Amino acid sequence: IRDKLVTGVQTCALPISDGINPSSCRNVRISDCFISVGDDCITIKSGRDADGRKYGKACENITITNCVMLSGHGGVVIGSEMSGGVRRVTISNCVFDGTDSGIRLKSSRGRGGVVEELRVDNIVMKNIQRNAFIFDLFYDKESKVEPVSERTPVFRNIHLSNITGSDIKQIGYIKGIEEMPVQGLSFSNINMKAEVGFIVDIAEDIRFDNVDFSSQTGSPWQFSKCKQIVLNNVRSKYPVNQQPIVTFEDVDNAIINNCFQMTPVKDFYKANNSHIIEGHNYWKKESFK
């Protein structure tokens, strides 16, 4: 399908059903919709495994704007059937209230395909039952490491900005695979308060600018097996007692810059087997007797 406008749709209380599902489509605009379903509210797909790669029709030039998502497993989901690729997608001016997840990208070994050039802006999330953000290349937990090939999925060049969230179970996670890290994500002007923070495992070139993450347990940011991490002007308004704001495990080249942690903490970060560069920071220390 090409050059399609979907506007003013209201879907409510559909059991075990997606709301709107563009698959291998081009030039689609979804706007001014109210969606409350039993499965994902909006799902973008492009075929599955070898058949999807052979057909080779990406889902591209997709705009989602001015929509409200209530309940449903995911607000906007890409995958896991994305073997033909998904590119040039914008999601803006939306509310997610009561969905299991907000923005969710999922794939696994064997799928192949590239998800890239995704922009998410001006989003409000509330009462998210699981994760606000998911970027998961390890959806099939039984898969084993294999050489990079057409079977290898890729997530890259994804940017999220101007997002607020409250009453959230977990801010989210990034999960790459050993042969293909998640690459080139940026988060800017984001404020999230959740029970659990943001966990990043096997990723590179990940950047946070003017971001406030607060979690009720553990550290708001947790990085492992990562490269090229930039934390610029990040903080936690409600840090957990004696927990660092950031933890690094096996991280190569992380930069912490312009971070002003005004709520006192014992340690802004803790690192193990990691290379960390600091610059122009102020971290107010807790006083311990």
Q: What do the predicted segments below correspond to?
A:
Residues 1-12:
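Single conserved hydrophobic/aromatic residue that forms the stacking wall/gate
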